Regions:
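Primarily recognizes Gram-negative and organellar outer-membrane beta-barrels
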Residues: 1-306
Length: 306
């Protein structure tokens, strides 16, 4: 069944004349499933090829999002505004697939070919692959921002401070099981050659960022303003991937479970560790001029990073 449900709520309230608050919440549920099968025939000069495949998959995901925003007029010269949000999204996916190739027509209904696979002549079979996978994960995120604006005098000189932060993290794990039989390739005992793989993958992630800025505006006469702004920001990112080969550690009929000694199957060549941090500064100064006929802006910005 394919399902898509969503529910939400919004709220706005004023507390007196100087403080207002707005918030929202949303919840979503998605569930999808599919079943497909395919049969192909290719007529080639070097020899005809026949193949069949089937796939069954289903997925389920949920998400919750909330946001809040507020504004506070402290006095005639000072205003504070802020907002924040939080979200999390768990998900789950499963799939089963099979495919096989032949050098002659298998002469069975392709929709039930794999159920009747043993009845197909061994002489026309080339290979067969059976695959199964399952993954689960969850991502989380929050962010907030606060800004303070202060008018310093009656001329309109203003000073502002802004602070922003966001953080996201998540973890995903997946199991994959595959078995491929090569009917034209024999092992040492004379049996059909078999390639078996059972892998576990874990992928934790984390991102964090901060931004702090200060800005200043000074009127110069009635038609011109001088403005200056400075911002500092930093961003951290971590993305790991750990892969474990379970083929020699778990029984062939066990799927989706970790044996006690699974860490001994760590595969360095299929794993990855990535960590990075970026720091940046930017300084911007400029002038604004406007009258009934003209509007002119001139600015200079500098952005060093490391």
């Amino acid at each position: 069944d394919n399902i898509n449900n969503s529910v939400g709520m919004n709220m706005t309230h004023k507390f007196g004349k100087k403080f207002s608050l707005t918030g929202s919440m949303n919840y979503n549920l998605n569930r999808n499933g599919n079943i497909s099968s395919m049969y192909q025939e290719q007529y080639l000069t070097a020899g005809n090829q026949y193949s069949a495949s089937t796939n069954e998959g289903n997925s389920k995901s949920r998400s919750f999002n909330s946001n809040i925003m507020g504004s506070w007029e402290v006095d005639k010269r000072t205003r504070i505004h802020f907002n924040g949000g939080f979200s999390f999204s768990p998900n789950r996916n499963e799939s089963n697939s099979q495919n096989a190739s032949f050098d002659a027509p298998p002469n069975v209904n392709h929709e039930s070919l794999f159920d009747d696979f043993e009845s197909i002549s061994q002489d026309i079979k080339v290979n067969r692959s059976e695959n199964r996978s399952r993954s689960e994960g969850q991502s989380n995120r929050y962010n907030w921002m606060m800004g303070i604006m202060r008018r310093l005098n009656e001329k309109g000189t203003t000073l502002g401070l802004n602070i922003q932060s966001s953080d996201s993290w998540g973890d995903n794990e997946s199991f994959s099981l595959s078995k491929t039989t090569y009917f034209r390739l024999k092992d040492k005992q004379g049996n059909d050659s078999l390639l078996y793989r059972n892998q576990y993958l874990k992928s934790p992630q984390k991102n964090n960022s901060w931004r702090v800025g200060i800005n200043f505006t000074q009127p110069i006469g009635k038609k011109m303003h001088f403005r200056a702004a400075y911002n500092w920001n930093t961003h951290y990112e971590r993305d790991n991937r750990d892969t474990y080969e379970l083929s020699s550690l778990a029984k062939s009929d066990v799927f989706g479970e970790l044996p006690p000694d699974y860490e001994t199957g760590y595969v360095d060549s299929l794993s990855n560790r990535s960590h990075s941090r970026t720091n940046g500064h930017d300084l911007n100064v400029g002038f604004n001029y406007s009258d009934d006929t003209w509007m002119v802006n001139a600015s200079l910005g500098i952005t060093p990073q490391r």
